[in-house]
C-alpha cells in the first residue's frame, strides 16, 4: 500500500527519490520508506529508537539495500530494526 502524500516526506538519496513517513508507538518509532516513482514496489518498515532523527532515513535506505531491499520490485514489505550496531532484519 502506498504512503499518503500529505503525511509523508520526500528524500533524495544518491539521485533517487524516496517517500517516507514515521509513526510513534509506545516502544519505538516505525518508519516506512518506498520508492517515490514506484509506490507499489517493496516497502521497508523499520523499527527505530524513540529518539528519531531524520538522517536515520538515509541509514535505513542504504543498509536496507545492502540487506536485499528492492523497492523497484513488487513484493511483501521488508521488516528491519535500527540499532546502535546498524540495521538488522527481523521476522514480520
Language-model segment annotations:
Residues 21-45:
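Short, surface-exposed, low-complexity cationic segments
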Residues 10-12, 17-19, 32, 45, ...:
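Ser/Thr- (and often Asn-) enriched beta-sheet segments in non-cytosolic proteins
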Residues 1-26:
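Short, charged/polar N-terminal "headpieces" of proteins
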Amino acid at each position: 500500500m502506498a504512503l499518503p502524500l500529505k503525511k509523508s516526506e520526500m528524500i533524495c538519496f544518491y539521485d533517487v527519490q524516496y517517500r517516507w513517513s514515521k509513526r510513534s508507538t509506545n516502544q519505538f518509532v516505525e518508519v516506512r520508506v518506498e520508492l517515490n516513482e514506484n509506490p507499489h514496489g517493496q516497502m521497508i518498515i523499520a523499527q527505530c529508537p524513540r529518539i528519531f532523527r531524520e538522517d536515520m532515513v538515509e541509514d535505513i535506505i542504504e543498509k536496507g539495500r545492502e540487506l536485499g531491499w528492492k523497492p523497484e520490485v513488487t513484493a511483501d514489505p521488508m521488516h528491519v530494526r535500527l540499532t546502535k550496531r546498524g540495521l538488522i532484519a527481523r521476522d514480520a
